[in-house]
């Protein structure tokens, strides 16, 4: 029970911080944190909640299938399947899915992936070589959630990572809440920088292919 309360508090603090950045517009986005490994349980945001508010109904505890552990009228977020795929296939401890203008714009500039390089903040992703390059996959935003989940699952390759969904934000996961939030902040910085650089250079013709 102590672990449940500890993780609830941790996830609530992350929600508050990301809310101040306006990364949950119009109730969008979902976040989760692992509570136990065996059996697998995790807290995840309830569907349709205003994340600028803090209430006792912000999160619910679900199992490895994303099914609520306790009887509740709350529904887990629509994209819970993405979280279950991550937790069932890695040792990740926290998953953050947010919609920002920048990460949506990026998915309209590129088709299958975006490549970013030679930025100091890439070290926040535990990549230390000079002039490092990263590739972030972009998948289509299927309305059929099982199809979306299956396409997403193909890009889960470790205890930390990120996948962009076209016009549907980014999902980032990490070893724990600190790691996941750090990675999310790094990706969002990189997206913002990249878009600003393209605008200064004269648009997508200098560095990206418009995809729409």
UniProtKB/Swiss-Prot annotation:
Question: Which InterPro entries does this chain map to?
Answer: Aldolase_II/adducin_N, Aldolase_II/adducin_N_sf, MethylthioRu-1-P_deHdtase_MtnB
A Pfam family found in this protein is Aldolase_II
Q: Name one GO cellular component term.
A: cytoplasm
Q: Which SMART domains match?
A: Aldolase_II
Tell me if Metal-binding is a UniProt keyword of this record. Answer: yes
Needs which cofactor?
Zn(2+)
Which GO biological-process labels does this protein carry? L-methionine salvage from methylthioadenosine
Q: Which reaction does it catalyse?
A: 5-(methylsulfanyl)-D-ribulose 1-phosphate = 5-methylsulfanyl-2,3-dioxopentyl phosphate + H2O
Question: One GO MF term, please?
Answer: zinc ion binding
Keyword Magnesium found: no
Protein keywords: Amino-acid biosynthesis, Lyase, Metal-binding, Methionine biosynthesis, Zinc
What does the note under cofactor report?
Binds 1 zinc ion per subunit.
Q: In which pathway does it act?
A: Amino-acid biosynthesis; L-methionine biosynthesis via salvage pathway; L-methionine from S-methyl-5-thio-alpha-D-ribose 1-phosphate: step 2/6
Question: Which EC numbers characterise this protein's activity in its record?
Answer: 4.2.1.109
To which protein family does this belong? Belongs to the aldolase class II family. MtnB subfamily.
Q: How does it assemble?
A: Homotetramer.
Quote the function comment for this protein: Catalyzes the dehydration of methylthioribulose-1-phosphate (MTRu-1-P) into 2,3-diketo-5-methylthiopentyl-1-phosphate (DK-MTP-1-P).
- Which PANTHER family does this chain map to? METHYLTHIORIBULOSE-1-PHOSPHATE DEHYDRATASE
This protein is called what?
Methylthioribulose-1-phosphate dehydratase
The major lineage groups are: Bacteria, Bacillati, Bacillota, Bacilli, Bacillales
Q: Which gene encodes it?
A: mtnB
